[in-house]
Amino acid sequence: MNKWDERFINLAEFIGEWSSCYQDGRHVGAVIVKDKRVLATGYNGAPSGVVSCKERGECLRKKLNIPSGTRQETCYAVHAEQNAICQAAKMGFCVDGATIYVTHQPCTICTKMIINAGIKKVVYKHGYPDEFSLVLLKDAGVELVKYE
């Protein structure tokens, strides 16, 4: 790892603090970078105009007893990686060939978006219990690096 990796993973952690997720430890940040330039950032939170779990004062998933890593569609939040990719698209930035720095290993759904967006490298700090996402990244030739 070099000083740029450290800067961008630290930025992802800072962005993750903006998360509107109700649960502690679920604050995730993402930064998409190309040629040492930040293209877009994202954090996990409710879509624009939708009241977040933090504002509601409860976690929908916890209320419905949904285990972590399952039924991800039953959540108000959009994942950090998804938000970053959407922001890049909204602003007209091409992420093909870019690197995404994420506080946590991407889930399978985010992994599919990362692959289809053309992102070629994923740098993450914390693991996530989703082995299939690792298989997909390997199959697609996306470099995966755990920041130590």
Regions found by a protein language model. Name each.
Residues 1-148:
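Zinc-dependent deaminase catalytic domain
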